[in-house]
């Protein structure tokens, strides 16, 4: 039997937990008894795969099996929670370009007050398989932060208050470790 487990090496066969020893983009061979009926599935904290029953009738044959884990509701909820906390923390930075954050604003004039950020709307979160890796992807989406700062014109010295929403676009890759730890990495255009 040749078992492919893209994006998560864990699966169950006939109720027994197994962890594939190969890269998630490869299939791992397993020796099984024939004839037999083998039920494959996956259930972890953040992922679930529908059961797949595979009959093996010919000794010595190679039967391909693909266990396709999908994000469950808890996965989306946890990623949304972690990213919201990240955005809120970014908004506490009193600079125009918050460090390691997806939003920021530049001015060609002089900034004369401390920038004040607030989150208006988080980007919507959907989680799909990353076509370029064995991880998960939050596709590019737009959120909005709000910035208030006083700006002085370099041309005539007039002072105005910039008090507007600042849209930002971001994507994320997500790796789910075998201990269910999430590693979320920002992707920018």
Spell out what each predicted region is.
Residues 1-189:
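Short loop/turn and low-complexity linker motifs enriched in small/turn-promoting residues
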